[in-house]
Amino acid sequence: PQERTLLPSTSYFYARPEVLADAQKAKAIEAFLAAFVRAGKWSNANAQAWGEHYYRRFQKLDAESASAIQSSLSPLIFQTAGEAQPHHQRLMDTLLAAGSLPRRLDAKDSFVSTFDAVVTANR
């Protein structure tokens, strides 16, 4: 749909500071993110095969439903912390304007660049 080109869907991975400070856990997050980005890149490039496998065989949806779902989705985009901040700031500013936040928040406080290299290397 047109709205997906205007404001794409957003996904974030959250980790508590104590998890990021643990070298073993940070290494596990790094491995997970690398695999997740590669899988997303593949599903973007192979939408028909992904839809057949996931929506038709795994979810057991009919072809029409699977097609409708897939046509409503935007491609997965994998951004570094700095690349994601402007979109996140717009979302927070929208929530502030709607009265859902008590004060303005700064998006730069929501991100760490710890995993930027793994995202960049795998996208």
Locations of the language-model features?
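Glycine-rich, flexible loop/turn motifs
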Residues: 15-16, 69, 107, 111
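Poly-acidic low-complexity segments
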Residues: 1, 46, 83-87, 106, ...
